[in-house]
């Protein structure tokens, strides 16, 4: 189901109580991305793992940012913001994943792979549009 590429991430809590601490993985499949994440459990509430599946055509941008003495970030921006509503800290279809140290080499490749798969999806969509226009003539 998955290619060999996955990136582990851990976003620290953004609120004072420490509730929005997230851990998860981004898997790159043949036809889609799968973002699996879980909020840190609270004293009286256990959280389930959330799974968000995104087609490559739905991804607007993927960027890997690596600066010295700062967390390594993999930034995803989607065309459908409602898919990322459950992700704490998501900003109108944009999420920043703080890549764990052991996944930094994969994160660089993931951004390039997403760009490549996006190109394939857009090419396929364009070919379908051309075929439809030829059939209607």
Language-model-detected regions and their locations in the chain:
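Acidic, Ser/Thr- and proline-rich intrinsically disordered linker/docking segments
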Residues: 1-23, 46-137
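Polybasic phosphoinositide-binding surfaces of eukaryotic membrane-targeting domains
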Residues: 22-37
């Amino acid at each position: 189901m998955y290619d060999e590429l996955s990136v582990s991430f851990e976003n620290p809590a953004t609120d004072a109580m420490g509730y929005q601490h997230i851990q998860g993985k981004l898997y790159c499949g043949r036809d889609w991305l799968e973002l699996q994440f879980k909020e840190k459990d609270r004293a009286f509430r256990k959280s389930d793992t959330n799974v968000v599946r995104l087609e490559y055509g739905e991804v607007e941008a993927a960027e890997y940012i690596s600066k010295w003495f700062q967390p390594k970030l993999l930034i995803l921006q989607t065309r459908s913001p409602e898919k990322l509503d459950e992700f704490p800290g998501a900003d109108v279809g944009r999420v920043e994943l703080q890549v764990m140290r052991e996944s930094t080499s994969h994160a660089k490749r993931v951004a390039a792979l997403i760009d490549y798969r996006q190109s394939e999806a857009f090419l396929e969509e364009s070919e379908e549009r051309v075929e439809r226009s030829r059939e209607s003539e």
